[in-house]
Amino acid sequence: EYAETNFELTVTSFLHENLRGLRRSMGSTKFEKQLIKQMKRTGTVAMCKLDNNTVLEKGLYYYQGNDFASELVYSIARLCEPCLEHTDNNFNPLDAIQKGEFGDVAEDITYLIQQCRKKLESNDYNDFEEEVRRANDLNAQLSHLKRQELQRIQSQTGSVRVSMIY
């Protein structure tokens, strides 16, 4: 739920130049980082009290889960930080084309996150390959957008500073 909420908050706040929303997302991200760090410490202490067979059997899953959660939080922070800095410094906003392209992809990413969350919550992994395919398609779409932006930079049709954040 954290990833879905904060990804959406970061993107919509950035597209609408909402500094308060970006700060809220960054604060939430810092809180989540601390929470994961605390859970990792607590889990490590708990692992010391379990017998070796149980630790070997279940410990790996615990640490992998923490690592995956950390990656999600780190990714949201890597998205939010430059958006916050860009908006806070009153740099030029994205132009209408960039907003449209990025907004469309962001909606698709939010939908993918929602679908994955539903599958995890219901413990139903049927057709999970469909979500993996959708994620790969979104990666390709993001690469395509990056190439288009590089072409705009080359043709000097936009602001370099705005292109950097895009």
Identify the meaning behind each predicted range:
Residues 1-166:
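Cytosolic, long alpha-helical scaffolding segments
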